[in-house]
Design a protein with these regions (language model features):
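FIC/Doc superfamily catalytic core
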Residues: 1-381
Length: 381
């Protein structure tokens, strides 16, 4: 079966025979027609992302928001894959003592994101960068058998637990076709296509997921690719857009629409879905920034009653809280190069002002949480 998106090809013979999908290179042929509802959605998505970008440039402590957004995107993207983990798990200051594999996976995703963003400053968005990022993502004991940082040499498939090539929901390109597809995708990413970058990002994500070049981690790398592409194109200046928020909320539709492209060649319905994802995710990010800014300003006023010395220390700890909303005193003191006693006094002030709350009284180290801040970030996780 062949359509605009590609063709299903036969592999092996006899009882071992199976069909894999060979994707057609991008851009689609015939070309994407951007008109009607698609054009309306494109304008709306671009407008909301521009608003988000405007906020990013005006907020002095945007770096703190971005740090949290990277963690939230990592968590949401991992949850799409079935990871059982909470925001509190990955923000816990004693996280290195956590032996939960799901938590380790999300922490690796955060590291992979930070690595890729830094690497993008010196490398174009290419297969080398994608492989290097994948190696960081699977940097754990259970990731070693999945060939971290290497495209696969064997056939993979997508299906439920215990599924085989015979009953798989989808069989990506065989290894030879996969290498061709990834080479074509790399060329497309770095081409001068006249399509709007948001539409290009939707196509690139679809193509990467369809090609499934790795034995594991394809979904997470594929979603990270969206942010990296938009940053390279100058649409985003920071990774402030967590698109996995929308994809998680519409997970079944997300997978179903990709399947529809492969079966019918209908890229337009996929692009329509993705533009809605961009618009809704940008709107949610804007709303979150507004709420966090309001909370920041409200709590900052509480420090006006402090002495100059107390205020200086309190502001340092407060700024730290906005990128680490769950703390213990010792780690905070070390990170800020302050004495234990000074941080302890500030924590006491923040508890009195109802900014901090002691949330773990069972362990040796007392854990304190910035509850209002966490409640805003916790939405949809």
């Amino acid at each position: 079966m062949t359509n605009r998106a590609g063709t299903f090809v036969s592999n092996l013979s006899g009882e071992m025979a199976y069909e894999s999908f060979r994707p057609a290179p991008l851009p689609p042929n015939p070309p994407i027609e951007v008109s009607g509802e698609l054009l309306t959605k494109l304008i709306d998505a671009n407008k909301k992302i521009a608003t988000l970008e405007g906020l990013s440039s005006r907020i002095p402590n945007m770096g703190l928001f971005v740090s949290m957004y990277v963690r939230k995107e990592a968590l949401l993207s991992s949850q799409i894959e079935g990871t059982q983990c909470t925001l509190e798990d990955i923000l816990n200051p004693l996280i290195e003592n956590n032996t939960n594999r799901d938590v380790s996976d999300v922490v690796n995703y955060i590291r992979a994101t930070e690595f890729a963003l830094e690497r993008l400053k010196t490398l174009p968005l290419c297969n080398r960068l994608i492989k290097e990022t994948h190696a960081v993502l699977l940097e754990s004991a259970r990731g070693q058998e999945k060939n971290p940082g290497e495209f696969r040499y064997s056939q993979n498939w997508i299906g439920g637990q215990g599924s085989t090539l015979k009953n798989a929901r989808y069989i990506p390109p065989n290894p030879e076709d996969m290498l061709t597809a990834m080479s074509d995708l790399e060329k497309y990413i770095n081409s001068d296509d006249t399509l709007d970058p948001l539409i290009q990002a939707a196509l690139i994500h679809y193509q990467f997921e369809t090609t499934h070049p790795f034995l594991d981690g394809n979904g997470r790398v594929g979603r990270l690719l969206i942010t990296l592409f938009l940053m390279e194109k100058g649409i985003l200046s920071t990774p402030a857009l967590y698109i996995s928020y929308y994809l998680k909320m519409n997970r079944i539709e997300y997978y179903g629409r990709m399947t529809q492209v492969r079966r019918t060649g209908d890229y337009e319905q996929w692009i329509s879905f993705f533009l809605q994802a961009f618009a809704d995710s940008a709107e949610d990010a804007i709303h979150t920034i507004d709420r966090l800014t309001e909370l920041h300003d409200k709590n900052l006023k509480l420090f006006d009653a402090l002495t100059k010395r107390q205020r200086t220390s309190a502001l340092k700890v407060f700024a730290y809280l906005e990128s680490n909303p769950i703390i213990d005193i010792q780690k905070t003191a070390t990170a800020l190069e302050m004495s234990y006693n000074t941080v302890a006094k500030v924590v006491s002030i923040l508890i009195d002002d109802e900014i901090l709350e002691q949330t773990d009284k069972s362990g040796k180290a007392k854990i304190y949480s910035y509850i209002e801040y966490l409640n805003i970030l916790r939405k949809d996780t």
